[in-house]
Curated annotation (Swiss-Prot):
Superkingdom classification of source: Bacteria
Protein name per the record: Lipoprotein signal peptidase
Family: Belongs to the peptidase A8 family.
Keyword Cell membrane: yes
Main location: membrane
Gene this protein is translated from: lspA
Lineage: Bacteria, Fusobacteriati, Fusobacteriota, Fusobacteriia, Fusobacteriales
Membrane topology: Multi-pass membrane protein
Cellular component terms (Gene Ontology): plasma membrane
Originating organism: Fusobacterium nucleatum subsp. nucleatum (strain ATCC 25586 / DSM 15643 / BCRC 10681 / CIP 101130 / JCM 8532 / KCTC 2640 / LMG 13131 / VPI 4355)
Length: 165
């Protein structure tokens, strides 16, 4: 990684390394707690009728797509992680602070789910907002989605001036 990110100073990247680790720890710890305390399919109401913790073993990708295709999903995930890391390192000095945060979140979420695929052969999902959403997901998914939204916001609202010039 040091050769690939050789143009990035360690001091410049410490905030992103710290954010990456904090997000990864939150994701992995929440999965560990759910995996060790709940049975598959078990639901614990947190906010009645709105938010539950429900233990699901997802053997596909987001929204339950590609169930049982763990090999293909894992290969695609490794490629995506590599591309994200390459882009982040190559463009670190060119992209904005908001984009750096966004890519760090996406990278952390992708690594969090990849850890599950490698060590469990499934991804632990538990965040269940039945009142408004039919899918059950995890914190890694949250980080990825927030990161994508931040990139979209950056490009729509903050890069307009660059495009107009």
């Amino acid at each position: 990684m040091s050769k690939m990110c050789s143009s990035v100073e360690i001091g410049d990247s410490m905030i992103y390394i710290f954010l990456f680790l904090i997000l990864l720890i939150i994701d992995q710890y929440s999965k560990f707690i759910v995996d060790s305390t709940l049975s598959v399919g078990e639901t614990v109401p947190v906010i009645d009728g709105f938010f539950n913790l429900t233990y699901v073993q997802n053997r596909g990708v987001a929204f339950g797509l590609f169930q049982g295709k763990i090999d293909i999903v894992s290969i695609l995930a490794v490629i995506a992680i590599g591309l994200i890391l390459f882009y982040f390192c190559k463009n670190f000095k060119k992209i904005s602070f908001l984009e750096r945060i966004a890519y760090t979140m996406i990278f952390s979420g992708a690594i969090g789910n990849m850890i599950d695929r490698l060590f469990r052969a499934y991804v632990v999902d538990m965040l269940d907002f039945r009142g408004i959403w039919s899918f059950i997901f995890n914190f890694a998914d949250v980080w990825i989605n927030i990161g994508v939204v931040l990139i979209i916001v950056e490009h729509i609202f903050f890069n307009r001036k660059k495009r107009v010039k």
